[in-house]
Regions:
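C-terminal non-catalytic regions of proteins with extracellular/luminal or membrane-system context
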Residues: 1-252
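A short, hydrophobic C-terminal helix/tail in secreted or cell-surface proteins
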Residues: 253-257
Length: 257
């Protein structure tokens, strides 16, 4: 399993990388924030990996209902998966404190999220110099993340979900408008990042869009995509459709389907 640290070291060398744990995912007794601050002050760039985990720690038992029960005196870093439900989308433990402390050093701050569910990213979207959502990236994920961070691979992924600003917005559907089109008292009603959102190190230009109706139920869509930036890259072209009129099935009295 390649961690993000492993991937970064392969790009540089162990002598050029200073690692500090900082904090745990959930356990607030793990506190190396001051050590992380000192390391950040000695560094040119700060890369912080935060988020969650669904890795079984084998200290957790499960009830017949599937609910997770941690051993007394231990705090599992697992916060996602079967039996692990969340009441908020915030970073757990001291992770938010770690981010804010490192940002105050004034060094360029890159935040990498490892997550199994969309976590709240309001602070990072405003204060971080770069933000990368990697979800659970797999066995070679550390190398893949390092490739993106060091510019050896141009990211082209697009969000498969909408990222909410607050747990109060859930559910956030890309294909369903809110029943009332106005903002909340505290935040905008729009998602922080919409379904299909993503960034690239280059830019693309679309032109010559044509939609040709081949038959009553068949349309052909064509267009040109040009890379107008300085770097090679891949583009995910997205096409969204909706019915102008939708047929409804009217049930008879006492029918359920």
């Amino acid at each position: 399993m390649k961690t993000v640290l492993d991937g970064i070291i392969t790009k540089l060398s162990p002598s050029r990388v200073e690692y500090v744990r900082g904090c745990a995912i959930r356990d607030t007794t793990v506190n190396e924030i001051e050590q992380a601050i000192e390391a950040a002050r000695r560094s040119e760039v700060v890369i912080v990996v935060v988020g969650g985990s669904s890795a079984r720690d084998f200290k957790t038992s499960y009830k017949e209902t599937g609910a997770a029960v941690a051993e007394e005196g231990s705090v599992s870093d697992m916060e996602c998966g079967e039996g692990f439900d969340r009441a908020s989308l915030s970073l757990l433990g001291r992770q938010q404190e770690l981010l804010e402390s490192l940002q105050k050093t004034g060094k360029p701050l890159i935040v990498v999220y490892i997550e199994g569910r969309p976590l709240e990213k309001n602070w990072a979207s405003e204060y971080a110099d770069a933000l990368l959502t990697a979800y659970y990236p797999g066995q070679e994920g550390g190398n893949a993340i390092a490739d993106v961070l060091f510019g050896d691979y141009n990211p082209s992924g697009r969000l498969p979900i909408s990222v909410p600003r607050s747990v109060g917005q859930i559910p956030v559907y890309y294909n369903k408008k809110a029943p009332r089109n106005h903002d909340y008292v505290e935040v905008s009603s729009s998602p922080l990042y919409s379904f299909g959102y993503g960034m690239s190190y280059t830019t693309f230009e679309y032109s010559d869009l044509q939609v040709v109706q081949k038959s009553a139920r068949c349309f052909e869509v064509s267009f040109k995509v040009k890379n107008t930036g300085k770097y090679d890259g891949e583009e995910v072209s997205q096409l969204y459709m909706r019915d102008e009129s939708v047929s409804y099935t009217h049930l008879r009295a006492h029918e359920t389907k």
